[in-house]
Amino acid sequence: WKYKRQQNRFFMELLAGWIQLMQRELQTREWFDAFGDLFMALSSRGGQQAHGQFFTPVHICDLMVQCTGTDEKTTGKRMNDPTCGSGRLLLAYHVRNLGNYLVAEDISRTCCLMTVCNMLIHGCVGEVIQHDSLLPEDFKDGWFVNPVLTTTGIPTIRKMSEDEYRTSRNIPLSGLKQRMAQFQKRKDAPVSRPACLTSKKTIS
């Protein structure tokens, strides 16, 4: 194990406390994002604005789902949030539209792990991808959440391999490194200035 016995015991106490909190809150709410609230409270002390991380308020998430919803319940669809944060927008959708496959994406590993935990305890079925959603080839990590929940009733998490990610999205492995290198080269290239700004000639 990576941690010592005393540390593992502390983590188990945290897990038990989180489960008890969720059981209490979900008696009066449809969903509850404890991790997102804690993360924003800690981030507001200093680094939140610098990192550009602002999670959508809970009531706004509910309002967005209600505004885009219809009387007809959708099932068997893939619903995606390319900047999931702690996954609260997908949670708001899930409680009103059960039976869909949720896909959460974020560049932050911390956000992805919060989403994994939230999807697990709320009974969501789907996957969480850590990458820049504008660069889908740049896969960093991924998790399948509750892949066997509908057949066994057991909540589980399974790591996603890079091959599984690319196969599901039809992203070929050949030429990937070359394209990423070309992108990085263009990104690091100096910006050329127009001739009118670089010329040293003066008008007499």
What do these predicted regions represent?
Residues W1-N97:
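Class I S-adenosyl-L-methionine
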Residues P57-V145:
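Conserved S-adenosyl-L-methionine
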Residues N118-I121, V125, I129-S204:
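S-adenosylmethionine
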Residues F32-A41, Q49, Q53, G87, ...:
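Aromatic-enriched hydrophobic runs in primary sequence
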Residues W1-M12, T28, I107, V116, ...:
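Proteins with a high burden of low-complexity, intrinsically disordered sequence enriched in S/T/G/P/A and R
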